């Protein structure tokens, strides 16, 4: 990976990536309707090549005789008709499973296709399926969303995918909400694919819309519901301008935290359903959640009906310990600045004065105290107490190793405008010199740092060692 001359700005991972991998390979035969499940650490590389037959990785078909490399991945290769794989490298664990959720996924896909066909038949007067996937942590929500997106793209649909889980990013860093239209396959090695900042790619890059949340859980702070409202407005407006995407609808991935509920009340789920006009609500891995939501959305007006569907949690879902999740978040941040695999990037190091940065730090608090389910008939962002959303901060040593979201707002804009503004990009604070009142920054591209409002959150956590 390249360094910037004289600055030693190569990424410094917590554990060595691309560690020596065994050159010994083995062949794995898979019978029809089985899948090869594996877990590989960030310090090792697993390679998989399809020798014969057909197979898919979260819905995306593997190309024959093409080697795919995986690091820090927990995944599964499924085959409908049987295949032969060539496997190399070291894994933490792997096995072949005969019981898989893929038939249920296929049935769900065909049900969504019927709704898309209805949208086409109506001349796009009706929107396609508006899907929200909910469930506890580690229940396979993101995997299901990937499969549904891949299957839709393979049938020439262009669904919109929305990520409302701040614990892991989609085409952005953790701590953000993002949305993107998918008209091509989902990348196998890079997860959701790449954005224009990631450099050249054999798969068309995605153009995500990003809002910065900056907190770990939806229950924190005062910005979750306003940002959901803003994202819903942006997505539905975009679909009205794009007939193909409107027919395909959208799929929303959510945080497991919103599925915990309080006494059978799921405020954040209800808010998402209301703002996005969700009509298909998929529950994973929780009988109680399914029962509560079925009761909530039973006997509604047909024009506002919400179909609650229960899917079983896949046996391939594993608990991801906090150590793994932290390594995953740091890897996503490194990839944002330095690229992925062979597609390396050369970020720019810049030094600026304290006065050049207009930083607004999120004030954490009890969001639930502000928005109880019975307070308002409908949520209104104008009811938020704006004075306590952000506090203006001056650079200090505590800012080192943190990320700043550069918004499209001006620093003189009101706090609600700053909150609702999309993100232009992120910069990394490499060093703060209080004596000279200088800040050294790492930026994805050269040029002057914009004078826009910058948002500082508490999530993701600081990433030490990103630069030397």
Swiss-Prot record:
Assembly with partners or alone: Component of a pre-mRNA cleavage factor complex. Interacts directly with PCF11.
Family to which the UniProt record says this protein belongs: Belongs to the Clp1 family. Clp1 subfamily.
GO terms for cellular component: mRNA cleavage factor complex; nucleus
Residue ranges, annotated region (Disordered): 1-22
Membrane-spanning intervals of the chain: none
Classification via Pfam families: Clp1, CLP1_N, CLP1_P
Nucleotide-binding among keywords: yes
Keywords assigned: ATP-binding, mRNA processing, Nucleotide-binding, Nucleus
Subcellular location: Nucleus
Organism expressing this protein natively: Phaeosphaeria nodorum (strain SN15 / ATCC MYA-4574 / FGSC 10173) (Glume blotch fungus)
Function description: Required for endonucleolytic cleavage during polyadenylation-dependent pre-mRNA 3'-end formation.
The name this protein goes by in its record: mRNA cleavage and polyadenylation factor CLP1
Amino-acid positions noted as binding ATP in the UniProt annotation, renumbered to this chain: 35, 74, 138-143
GO molecular function: ATP binding; polynucleotide 5'-hydroxyl-kinase activity
Gene Ontology biological process terms, A to Z: mRNA 3'-end processing; tRNA splicing, via endonucleolytic cleavage and ligation
Principal location class: nucleus
Matches recorded under HAMAP family: Clp1
